[in-house]
Regions:
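Short amphipathic alpha-helical coiled-coil/interface segments
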Residues: 50-57
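Residues marking the start of alpha-helices
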Residues: 37, 89-92, 118
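Non-catalytic beta-strand/loop surface segments
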Residues: 1-23, 44-45, 59-113, 133, ...
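Helix N-cap motif at beta-to-alpha junctions
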Residues: 19-22, 120-125
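M16/insulysin-pitrilysin zinc metalloprotease superfamily fold
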Residues: 15-49
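Short amphipathic alpha-helices in soluble, non-transmembrane regions
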Residues: 28-33, 128-135
């Protein structure tokens, strides 16, 4: 099973295997290596995935979700990530092209910003060797990682209040 999740500060790709033969783990590591090296970002696949994302946005569109998003700037006052959601807006989803994805990947998918976690009932030395064999030769980037200036949280003192909804 393959899945991914994007939050405000990271994207995680997950493979869930019911079995864990060395060949199957190698196949999964090749999949992750492909993500690290750079997907092709086929324009037709981008259109298809955009439709999937828009459908996901529609399925999540609820009063509760809108309230949560409206509360972010209040709860996290001063932090820049409250201006957008990880999924984006319909406008950005429809306007992104292959070159946007390539640039985002080039800037953010770097060996020095990658963490690989393996959990399961397997020999730790064997899995460490497979991971090292798959990712050890990724070229180190010369340019520094991007600096994310998301602002500074404006701390407030504690306060109490009564809220009435009628």
């Amino acid at each position: 099973d393959v899945n991914a999740v994007t939050t405000f500060d990271y994207t995680a790709y997950m493979l869930d295997y019911r079995e864990h033969t060395p060949a199957l783990i190698d196949e999964g590591l090749r999949f992750f290596r492909g993500i690290a090296e750079g997907p092709t970002f086929d324009p037709q696949a981008i259109v298809w995935e955009s439709r999937v994302i828009l459908a996901e946005m529609r399925s999540r569109d609820s009063v509760t979700t809108r309230q949560q998003m409206d509360n972010l700037p209040v709860i996290f006052r001063g932090l820049g990530f409250t201006r957008h959601t990880p999924i984006g807006t319909e406008q950005t989803i429809l306007s992104f092209r292959r070159e946007h994805f390539l640039e985002f990947h080039r800037r953010n998918y770097r060996p020095d910003m990658t963490v690989i976690v393996a959990a399961g009932d397997f020999d730790p030395e064997q899995i460490a060797g497979q991971i090292s064999a798959s990712f050890g030769a990724l070229p180190k980037r010369e340019d520094p990682p991007p600096v994310r200036n998301e602002g500074r949280l404006n701390a407030r003192g504690l306060r109490a209040g009564i809220f009435r909804i009628s």
